[in-house]
Curated annotation (Swiss-Prot):
GO terms for biological process: cell division; chromosome segregation; DNA recombination. Disruption phenotype: Deletion blocks difH recombination. Deletion mutant shows impaired chromosome segregation, slight growth defect, UV and ciprofloxacin susceptibility, resistance to oxidative stress and inability to colonize mice. The active site is at R213, K239, H309, R312, H335, Y344. SUPFAM superfamilies: DNA breaking-rejoining enzymes (SSF56349). Belongs to the 'phage' integrase family. XerH subfamily. It holds the Pfam family Phage_integrase. This is Tyrosine recombinase XerH. Residues 170-357 form the Tyr recombinase domain. It comes from Helicobacter pylori (strain ATCC 700392 / 26695) (Campylobacter pylori). GO terms for cellular component: cytoplasm.
Length: 362
């Protein structure tokens, strides 16, 4: 169903209306492999139709993400920031550009990106660009006036400084070997309530010892674990619904696993999840982030980024340093491309020392 470009009198309300429609469309087109409760997704779709403020849209998108539509915030945050920019600019300026959606052009979007993405990482800036391109491409296809004509923006954002350049090889934040040992000790030392102690310690240790992604760990099921010859083989459902297996020495987690499985029997577990809250639902990535950050602070190891993904980088760095095998890193982490794994060669101390010693050779 197509809609007039400007149904309402206020251009900021019209912009919000289109953002809501686009986000609803994205909710139906994003990967739903992590969705466990379809009813929650239906609720979100219905609420997106009714949302009449940016705060309501933000709330619904968070709910959709928690329901398993993990990529929705990649679009929601930039677009709601653009709505904020458009609304503020309309109030404090007398420029006619903000009196109609038809006046939105590349210049305005470049100004928005310049103001709102300063200090953000290149990857985040690219997400802003992708979200804007997605929105205006959607509007191009979905708007139609009473004469069945559409207003076409044809936004490309090809010449935006700092957004189109190559991402380069930014070194990921990680813990070195000694710091990882300290972090592991802190997992056991930090105080936790009896109900979550075994669960949280088990969850975080599995991530440390395998390097799996946080959402992969949160979706693990008991049937994914096989014990043989003192090792657990863990079947992981990764990106693109691709499966891979990792191995973990049983002694690292065995006592915690037994303790948690006893506690877990008290909960109405849904979908055979290994890790769940007291309602039986999956834990959120936000909760996991807070728990990891709490342990990092306790250990005195605070970094720029303190979530579970840093533990993944730490595992990969240590794996490459000890084995010097990029294929092994790629397979263990589930990277689709070897180039993604190549970043960890920058942490190869042996190679760096060899480079530094060339001036001492005859």
């Amino acid at each position: 169903m197509k809609h007039p470009l400007e149904e309402l009198k206020d251009p900021t309300e019209n912009l919000l209306l289109w953002i809501g429609r686009f986000l609803r469309y994205k909710c139906t087109s994003l990967s739903n492999s992590q969705v466990k409760d379809q009813n929650k997704v239906f609720e979100c779709l219905n609420e997106l139709n009714q949302a009449c403020s940016s705060s309501q849209l933000e709330k619904v998108c968070k709910k959709a993400r928690n329901a398993g539509l993990l990529g929705i915030n990649t679009y929601a945050l930039p677009l709601l920031k653009f709505h904020e920019y458009f609304s503020k600019a309309r109030l404090i300026t007398e420029r006619l550009a903000f009196n109609s959606l038809k006046n939105i052009d590349e210049v305005m979007l470049a100004e928005f990106l310049s103001v709102y993405t300063g200090g953000l990482s290149l990857a985040t800036k690219k997400n802003y660009r992708i979200a804007l391109l997605g929105l205006f491409s959607y509007i191009d296809k979905q708007n139609q006036d009473e004469n069945e004509k559409s207003y076409i923006y044809n936004i490309t954002l090809k010449n935006i400084s700092g957004v189109n350049q190559s991402a380069g090889n930014k070194l990921p934040t990680h813990l070195n070997n000694e710091e990882l040992e300290k972090f592991l000790e802190s997992i056991d030392k930090i105080e936790m309530s009896a109900k979550v102690r075994a669960r949280n310690r088990l969850l975080i240790k599995i991530i440390v010892f395998t390097g799996m992604r946080s959402n992969e760990a949160l979706q693990l099921k008991i049937k994914d674990f096989t014990l043989e010859n003192g090792c657990y083989t863990i079947l992981i459902k990764g990106k693109g619904d691709k499966y891979r297996a990792v191995m973990l020495k049983a002694f690292h987690i065995e006592s915690l696993l037994k303790e948690w499985l006893i506690e877990r029997e008290l909960y109405p577990v849904k979908n055979d999840l290994l890790f769940c809250n007291q309602k039986g639902s999956a834990l959120t990535q936000a909760y996991l982030y807070k728990q990891v950050e709490r342990i990092i602070n306790f250990a005195g190891l605070r970094r720029e980024k303190n979530g579970a993904h840093m533990l993944r980088h730490s595992f990969a760095t240590l794996l490459y340093q000890k084995r010097h095998d990029l294929i092994l890193v790629q397979e263990a982490l589930g990277h689709a491309s070897l180039n993604t794994s190549r970043i960890y060669t920058h942490f190869d101390k042996q190679r760096l020392e060899e480079a530094a010693s060339i001036w001492e050779e005859n």
